[in-house]
Amino acid sequence: MNPFYSTFPDSFLSISDHRSPVSDSSECSPKLASSCPKKRAGRKKFRETRHPIYRGVRQRNSGKWVCEVREPNKKSRIWLGTFPTVEMAARAHDVAALALRGRSACLNFADSAWRLRIPETTCPKEIQKAASEAAMAFQNETTTEGSKTAAEAEEAAGEGVREGERRAEEQNGGVFYMDDEALLGMPNFFENMAEGMLLPPPEVGWNHNDFDGVGDVSLWSFDE
C-alpha cells in the first residue's frame, strides 16, 4: 500500500458509525479504476483533459484538477471542486462515488472503501463537504510525510558531518591541527625557510680595490 494513503487524521478517517458502505477491506475487494481502462474520448480536435486512470477528474489549463460525479439515473452532476493535485481530486471522487453507489462504486484508491467517512445522505451539499474534507486530509498527510522526509535527510547530513569530524580528531590523536601553509597559501613555506637558514651569510665587508679615489689619503702627517 502506498505510504501516502496509509494514515489520515482520526477525526475524519476513523472507522465509526459513518463508515463506508463497503464496511471492511476483508469482506470484499472494491472495484478499482486502475483495473477498468477508460475508453478513448470521441473528440479528436480537442486536447484530452481526463486523467488516464483516475475516475471523475479532469485537468484545467492552469494545471489544477477538477472533480465532478454523475448522479445515478440522472443527467445531472455534482460538482466537487478544484484541487491543486490530481490525488486530492481523485480522493474527493471516491467519497462521492461511495455515497451515491455504495459497493458498486469504482474507486481510485482501494483504501477509500474503509477509511473515508461517508455522509449519511446523498444530499449534494453533504457530499461536497465530505469530499472537501477527504481531499484536505490527503493534502495534510502528504505535507506531513514530505516534512518528515526533509527533516530526516537534514538530520542524516548533520550526523555525517559530525562523524567525519570525530574520525578526523581520532586520527590526529585528539589534537587539533591547523595547516598554516594552506592557510597562508604558501606551500613549502617552512621548508624553504629552513633551507635558507643553512646557507652561509652573505659578505658584508668591502675591498679597498673597490674604492674609486685618485690616490691614498693620509689621515696623519708626521713630516711637519
Curated annotation (Swiss-Prot):
Set out the biological process GO terms recorded for this chain's protein: abscisic acid-activated signaling pathway; glucosinolate metabolic process
Instruction: Name the keywords, alphabetized.
Output: Abscisic acid signaling pathway, Activator, DNA-binding, Nucleus, Stress response, Transcription, Transcription regulation
The biased composition feature labelled Low complexity covers: 141-150
UniProt-recorded Gene Ontology molecular function terms: DNA-binding transcription factor activity; transcription cis-regulatory region binding
> Where is the stretch described as Disordered?
20-45, 141-172
Q: What induces it?
A: By high-salt stress, drought stress and abscisic acid (ABA) treatment.
Keyword Repeat attached = no
User: Which positions carry the signal peptide feature in this UniProt record?
Assistant: none
Composition-biased stretches, type Basic and acidic residues, lie in 160-170
- Renumbered to this chain, motif Nuclear localization signal spans 38-50
Quote the DNA-binding region ranges, renumbered to this chain. 53-110
Q: Coiled-coil stretches, from where to where?
A: none
Which GO CC terms are listed, alphabetically?
A: nucleus
Main subcellular localisation: nucleus
Q: According to its UniProt record, where is this protein located?
A: Nucleus
Family as reported in the entry's similarity comment: Belongs to the AP2/ERF transcription factor family. ERF subfamily.
Report the protein's function. Answer: Transcriptional activator that binds specifically to the DNA sequence 5'-[AG]CCGAC-3'. Binding to the C-repeat/DRE element mediates abscisic acid- and dehydration-inducible transcription. CBF/DREB1 factors play a key role in freezing tolerance and cold acclimation.
Name by which UniProt lists this protein: Dehydration-responsive element-binding protein 1D
State the organism named in the record. Arabidopsis thaliana (Mouse-ear cress)
Organism lineage: Eukaryota, Viridiplantae, Streptophyta, Embryophyta, Tracheophyta
